[in-house]
Regions:
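Conserved beta-strand and immediately adjacent loop positions that scaffold enzyme active sites
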Residues: 4, 101, 124-126
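Pre-Walker A-like glycine/lysine-rich segment at the N-terminus of P-loop NTPase domains
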Residues: 2-66
Length: 173
């Protein structure tokens, strides 16, 4: 279940923008509209996005769509563009990275996924997991000197050399 999505420099969003599914203290229709996670976090099952025409409602949904596309895409071309579209109505932002941060629960466990990229390159991708009150880095890839470094937290996830090599061959420069 999604907790929140933060985006920056994506489509019509120049500044950081957040959509949160965390529920308020209101208890109206709590049983049918909310989910309470094991750690006590209350999440709304639904969200309503409203606003004036051309205010970014569709582009906020496009942020979710972009992440799903990014995760599912298959490419044998390690130099393939990322497909991200930064905010273009400012002279500085097209050359600055686009940022995504998705907080979510999967099978009752909290994760934070972070993605920083340009139209050409994936600059950083991180996945944190909460096994306690503090997040632990599970996976990190980043672009260093035009090459991508991929690291797994071996104390949390056992990744064989063969699997790491296969992942590297598929998605790294």
């Amino acid at each position: 279940m999604v907790i929140e999505l933060r985006i920056k420099n994506f489509l019509s969003f120049k500044e950081e923008t957040t959509i949160s599914f965390e529920a308020s203290k209101d208890t109206f229709k709590e049983d049918s509209l909310l989910v309470t996670m094991a750690d006590g976090t209350r999440l709304s099952r639904i969200a309503i996005i409203y606003g004036a025409n051309a205010s970014g409602k569709s582009n906020l949904l496009e942020a979710f769509e972009y992440l799903f596309w990014f995760w599912k895409r298959k490419t044998d071309d390690q130099d393939a563009p990322t497909g991200v579209e930064p905010f273009i109505l400012d002279s500085d932002t097209p050359s600055q990275p686009t940022e995504f941060e998705l907080k979510l629960y999967i099978n009752g466990k909290k994760y934070i996924y972070q993605l920083i990229l340009s139209p050409k390159d994936i600059l950083s991708e991180k996945l944190h997991v909460y096994n306690s009150n503090q997040p632990s880095l599970l996976m990190h890839r980043e672009l260093v000197d035009s090459n991508t470094a991929l690291k797994f937290n071996q104390s949390l996830i056992k990744v064989s050399a063969a699997v790491k090599d296969a992942v590297s061959a598929k998605c790294l420069k």
